[in-house]
């Protein structure tokens, strides 16, 4: 009270001698942002924060979207370390990159995605720009659609899709819709529902497709299903917008993972494509990605490139150099590229092995449920089919953290904790 009283006295004295001070204090106390509400927490980051606070030695974080080794530790690829050493030895400068990014990186990215002998590359009827990882590629693509896709503002996403797809396209001014994709009854691909919904999409709309390792379900169409989807997309004159964040990381074979993209192009469908090197090179914090537009001819590609640069310039001017140099060094050095391909396969194989071990351990626990979908799904993520109330029990009783929809990151499962996970899942689902 004494302090409060003295504060009032001092304030009064200051006002008496300096009337302007009171007005200044009042001005400082007012706010421009009183109307701004607290935003909701990110669901995945919220899982990580809760995990960090848990003191249980057996705790598991199955929400994180980053690869972990079999000890549960972050993994830097040896090929990345070698590339970094080679770059450091060159003593390169830190000058700005061009607006479109590192030229050799862009060329190598297009070759990785489309195949080195692809007709599109030989004819030059494409443009690839370096972006700030996959998210940046999506945003550049969304903004390009908003400005130049004059036919429609409608973008159709698979249901469900990566959570960031909606705000990226919505904030770029596009209208979001969905088509059936995941079947919760089978924990697999709703092929019939997808075809039915795609057939009803208005002509000249945009359809977003996950090239491989669908996030969050881990459910991918088979090649024969992709063929039917491509036929329908072409027949209905839809624009195919591919998101490929996991090339090589899904099956362990980069060509296999890019099959859908290449098939669509072979069928005469001019697509656009987003790439990320976060997962398949472990360059999460380097933010390395690319955005490619396949065009009618080389002249059209030049015009599209000029407008992509105009979009990029006020957004971030030009992309960062370090990650692009790492990726480019790996992709353009035959020995490093071969080593990297083996390392990517090793990461993919570990995740596939963890899926198999989890199902095997569930059977050992005596689970009567059919867990085949865990093995059938592909990539980092798995839609387990576990219900929200069961997820809550896993967290409270076993310190196992995941998103409420039952999605787990298989990268967080190791040979040391897979048995514990299987036991916990059995306990809450029996």
UniProtKB/Swiss-Prot annotation:
Under InterPro entries, the record lists: Aminotransferase_I/II_large (IPR004839), Asp_trans (IPR000796), NHTrfase_class1_PyrdxlP-BS (IPR004838), PyrdxlP-dep_Trfase (IPR015424), PyrdxlP-dep_Trfase_major (IPR015421), PyrdxlP-dep_Trfase_small (IPR015422)
Q: Report the catalytic activity.
A: L-aspartate + 2-oxoglutarate = oxaloacetate + L-glutamate; L-kynurenine + 2-oxoglutarate = kynurenate + L-glutamate + H2O
GO molecular function annotation: kynurenine-oxoglutarate transaminase activity; L-aspartate:2-oxoglutarate aminotransferase activity; pyridoxal phosphate binding
Give GO cellular component annotations, separated by semicolons: mitochondrial inner membrane; mitochondrial matrix; mitochondrion; plasma membrane
Which SUPFAM superfamilies has this protein been placed in? PLP-dependent transferases (SSF53383)
Residues where 3'-nitrotyrosine occurs? 96
Q: Where in the cell is it found?
A: Mitochondrion matrix; Cell membrane
Establish whether keyword Nuclease is in the entry.
no
- Cofactor(s), names only, from the UniProt record: pyridoxal 5'-phosphate
Give the misc comment.
In eukaryotes there are cytoplasmic, mitochondrial and chloroplastic isozymes.
| Role summary | Catalyzes the irreversible transamination of the L-tryptophan metabolite L-kynurenine to form kynurenic acid (KA). As a member of the malate-aspartate shuttle, it has a key role in the intracellular NAD(H) redox balance. Is important for metabolite exchange between mitochondria and cytosol, and for amino acid metabolism. Facilitates cellular uptake of long-chain free fatty acids.
Q: Which NCBIfam families match?
A: PRK09257.1
- Return the protein name: Aspartate aminotransferase, mitochondrial
What organism does the UniProt record list as the source?
A: Sus scrofa
């Amino acid at each position: 009270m004494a302090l409060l009283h003295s504060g009032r006295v001092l304030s009064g004295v200051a006002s008496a001698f300096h009337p302007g001070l009171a007005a200044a204090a009042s001005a400082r106390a007012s706010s421009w942002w009183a109307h701004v509400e607290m935003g909701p927490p990110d669901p995945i980051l919220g899982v990580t924060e809760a995990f960090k606070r848990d003191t249980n030695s057996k705790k598991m974080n199955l929400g994180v979207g980053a690869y972990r080794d079999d000890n549960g530790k972050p993994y830097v690829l040896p090929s990345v370390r070698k590339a970094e050493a080679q770059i450091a030895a060159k003593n390169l400068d830190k000058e700005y990159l061009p607006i479109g990014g590192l030229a050799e990186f862009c060329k190598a990215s297009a070759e990785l995605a489309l195949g080195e002998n692809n007709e599109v590359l030989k004819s030059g009827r494409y443009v690839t720009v370096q972006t700030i990882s996959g998210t940046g590629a999506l945003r550049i693509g969304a903004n390009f659609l908003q400005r130049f896709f004059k036919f429609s503002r409608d973008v159709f996403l698979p249901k469900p899709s990566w959570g960031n797809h909606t705000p990226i396209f919505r904030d770029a001014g596009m209208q979001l819709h969905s088509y059936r994709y995941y079947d919760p009854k089978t924990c697999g691909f709703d092929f019939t529902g997808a075809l039915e919904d795609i057939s009803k999409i208005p002509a000249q709309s945009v359809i977003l497709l996950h090239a491989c390792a669908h996030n969050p379900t881990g459910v991918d169409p088979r090649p024969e299903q992709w063929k039917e989807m491509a036929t329908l997309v072409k027949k209905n004159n839809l624009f195919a917008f591919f998101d490929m964040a996991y090339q090589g990381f899904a099956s362990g074979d980069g060509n296999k993972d890019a099959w859908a993209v290449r098939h669509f192009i072979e069928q005469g469908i001019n697509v656009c494509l987003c790439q990320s090197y976060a997962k398949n090179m472990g360059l999460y914090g380097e933010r390395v990605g690319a955005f490619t537009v396949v065009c009618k001819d080389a002249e059209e590609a030049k015009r599209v490139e000029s407008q992509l640069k105009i979009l990029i310039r006020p957004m971030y001017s030009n992309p960062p150099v370090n990650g692009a140099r790492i990726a480019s060094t790996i992709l353009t050095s035959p020995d490093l590229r071969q080593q990297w391909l083996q390392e990517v396969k090793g990461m993919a194989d570990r995740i596939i092995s963890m899926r198999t071990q989890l199902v095997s351990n569930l059977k050992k626990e005596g689970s009567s449920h059919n867990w085949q979908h865990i093995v059938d799904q592909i990539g980092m993520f798995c839609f387990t089919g576990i219900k929200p109330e069961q997820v809550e029990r896993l967290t409270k009783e076993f310190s196992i953290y995941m998103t409420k929809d039952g999605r787990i990151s298989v990268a967080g499962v190791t040979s040391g904790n897979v048995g514990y996970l299987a036991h916990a899942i059995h306990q809450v689902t029996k």
